Regions:
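Cytosolic juxtamembrane regions of integral membrane proteins
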Residues: 19-96
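Hydrophobic alpha-helical bundles in membrane proteins
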Residues: 62-300
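Disordered, charged N-terminal biogenesis/targeting segments of membrane/secreted proteins
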Residues: 1-31
């Protein structure tokens, strides 16, 4: 089996390092259980696929995915958190006991449990246990995608919602393991998720007297996050905008189902909103560069 896995590597990489990888695997698997050997082989296969696709920490694509991964996790948590709080609001308003809705083995229950798993996994990942949290997030998103296809319009569009859920899972999985997000990035992603989620819950609970976001509020939050990150790092904002764009599939699904149910406007806005933040950050960068030139000219 390990021989077939090694074939996943690019030919040049396999020629240079294939024997070394094989030797390390045999040494590690010698005293390992069957589960341990399977896990080691799975890790090698994942690394081989990343190298084949150019998604390692040495490539720009890999670094982009690493920057986007915590925000993708936060976006998934915010979207699924809306499902969970919507269910809770229904339970509060219903005269039936809460446990009866959970004990009924139907598609709605599967959707709810998958959403709860995503939320718990995201909290786990963003509070320091990234690997275990990501496993829960990916499992929850996969379950959500499957249940949404079966349920129809219960939790969203039967095509767009599962497609965006699976795309988010792939984005999170593709993050290079040696570029796991640090505490600051995780804290920022958690704050972004909270700011995206809380007003939506307030609107559903009729705490706010109006609702005019048409599904776009979470995308606006991502754009603002990219702008803030660009301003803090004093960069043109292109990297931050790209990361926010990669992280936005869960919010695109929400905009599609919670807004107009029209794919073209939502996709256009999903691409334009993060880029608006990049343009604003780039304008700030140009102003700062102009000031620097003026100061240097004044010193001459």
């Amino acid at each position: 089996m390990i021989g077939l896995i090694l074939r996943l590597y690019p030919p040049r990489y396999r020629q240079d390092l294939g024997e070394e990888i094989l030797a390390v695997y045999r040494l590690t698997a010698a005293d390992a259980s069957r589960t341990g050997r399977f896990r080691e082989a799975a890790d090698i296969a994942a690394h081989a696929v990343r190298m084949r696709l150019g998604l390692s920490s040495a490539t720009a694509a890999g670094r982009l995915l690493a920057s986007a991964a915590p925000y993708a996790v936060g976006a998934a948590a915010a979207g699924c958190g809306v499902h969970v709080t919507r269910w809770y609001a229904g339970v509060v308003a219903s005269p039936s006991p809460a446990h009866l809705s959970l004990l009924s083995a139907d598609t709605w229950t599967a959707l709810l449990l998958a959403s709860a798993l995503v939320v718990v996994g995201a909290i786990t990942a963003l509070t320091g246990r990234w690997h275990g949290g990501v496993i829960a997030v990916v499992a929850g998103l996969s379950g959500l995608a499957a249940a949404t296809v079966v349920s129809g319009a219960a939790f969203g569009d039967p095509v767009i919602t599962p497609a965006m859920a699976l795309l988010t899972a792939l984005i999170v999985l593709a993050c290079p393991p040696d570029l796991r997000p640090g505490p600051r990035a995780c804290a920022a992603a958690g704050a972004t998720a909270a700011v995206a989620w809380l007003p939506l819950v307030a609107v559903q609970a009729h705490v706010l007297p109006f609702s005019t976001d048409y599904g776009l509020w979470p995308l606006l939050v991502l754009a603002a996050t990219g702008l803030v990150l660009a301003l803090r790092s004093k960069s043109p904002g292109l990297k931050e905008a790209a990361a926010m764009t990669v992280a936005c599939p869960p919010f695109l699904a929400y905009a599609y189902t919670g807004g107009w149910d029209m794919s073209l406007p939502v996709l256009a806005i999903g691409a334009a909103v993060p880029l608006t933040g990049a343009m604003a950050a780039y304008a700030y960068h140009l102003v700062q560069r102009g000031r620097g030139r003026a100061e240097r000219a004044g010193l001459r």
